[in-house]
Amino acid sequence: MSVKDKREKMTATREEFAEVQQAFAAYADEFAADVDDKRDVSELVDGIDTLRTEMNSTNDAFRAYSEEFAADVEHFHTSVADRRDAFDAYADIFATDVAEMQDVSDLLAAIDDLRAEMDETHEAFDAYADAFVTDVATLRDVSDLLTAISELQSEFVSVQGEFNGYASEFGADIDQFHAVVAEKRDGHKDVADAFLQYREEFHGVEVQSLLDNIAAFQREMGDYRKAFETTEEAFASFARDFYGQGAAPMATPLNNAAETAVTGTETEVDIPPIEDSVEPDGEDEDSKADDVEAEAEVETVEMEFGAEMDTEADEDVQSESVREDDQFLDDETPEDMVQCLVCGEYYQAITEPHLQTHDMTIKKYREEYGEDVPLRPDDKA
């Protein structure tokens, strides 16, 4: 609250106090009139005491407000004095700054230094302009360049002549190379025709005859098996008649070896088909030679396989003839056979074609059953 507001408030309070005094004077006049009219003033005693109490309270309130107002005025005077001191200090600092700004000796020295540097730069630009003019004059002298261009043109002409000669020689070499390629292509075609003829002859005559022999051998083995069964039944009947009912010997005939041999023979004669490896014209000579060597190796394997089949057939016939002489054998694995660990059957050898019927190879067979797994009877030792 400002001083003006406080003064206006005090003025309003004084006016209210004057109005109260006027009202009190009017009330006193009225009271005096009433006293004259009414001698009994006992009812007004309490009103007078109340009015006095109110007037004392009003005086106390004005006194307290006067003290508070005096304290506020003192505080305002103190703050004004502090601001005056701050303004005086700022005026001193401002005067010092103005004095320093009015001292332009450093600025004049910097201007002199700048003028000196500008003069040096102007001199450097003049020197550069002179050097540039000299360089331009030197660059305009193209006599050496023209001489070098003439020499380069001469070299290009000579190189062009050499390239023309080389192109002629290269064309002749290319024609000769084409002739050699055509000759080799014809040779490859003749080899392919001969190979096709050989393959047709091999598969149409030799392989078919081998398959016919195998089928005949299988039929012969079937006849042997039927004869063995007939002999076994006759011998069993003879044993029952000889020993009497229920007194037949406990020996049991063994036909597993014969059946195993037949099964092994039937399994091992499966010959995988030979895929057509003849390439069209245009293949290189090395691939043709590799195909011929591969077919030769296949033929050698087939011939060795046929010889092995004939040998196994002879051995089976001999073993069957021995079994006719002696029908009762001990229940043991033959020493000249080896067991396949996949199907459990016994064969004279575990071969690649047999393992292919189990979707396996010899390498995979050894990985699954061990490197020492026997593939032939000799391996068991």
Curated annotation (Swiss-Prot):
Pfam hit, one: Halo_GVPC
Record field: transmembrane: none
Post-translational modification: Detected as 2 slightly different sizes in vivo; the proteins appears larger in SDS-PAGE probably due to the acidic tail.
Record region (Disordered): 261-333
Factors inducing expression: Expressed from a single promoter upstream of gvpA; most transcripts stop at the gvpA terminator, with low read-through into downstream gvpC-gvpN-gvpO. Expression starts in early stationary phase and is maximal in stationary phase. Highly expressed in 25% salt, poorly expressed in 15% salt, no gas vesicles are formed at 15% salt.
Keyword vocabulary terms for this entry: Gas vesicle, Repeat
Sequence repeat locations: 22-59, 60-84, 85-122, 123-160, 161-192, 193-232, 233-274
Similarity-based family: Belongs to the halobacterial gas vesicle GvpC family.
Function comment: Confers stability, involved in shaping gas vesicles (GV), hollow, gas filled proteinaceous nanostructures found in some microorganisms. They allow positioning of halobacteria at the optimal depth for growth in the poorly aerated, shallow brine pools of their habitat. Expression of a 9.5 kb mc-vac DNA fragment containing 2 divergently transcribed regions (gvpD-gvpE-gvpF-gvpG-gvpH-gvpI-gvpJ-gvpK-gvpL-gvpM and gvpA-gvpC-gvpN-gvpO) allows H.volcanii to produce gas vesicles.
Further remark: Encoded in a 14-gene locus called mc-vac.
The protein's name in its UniProt record: Gas vesicle protein C
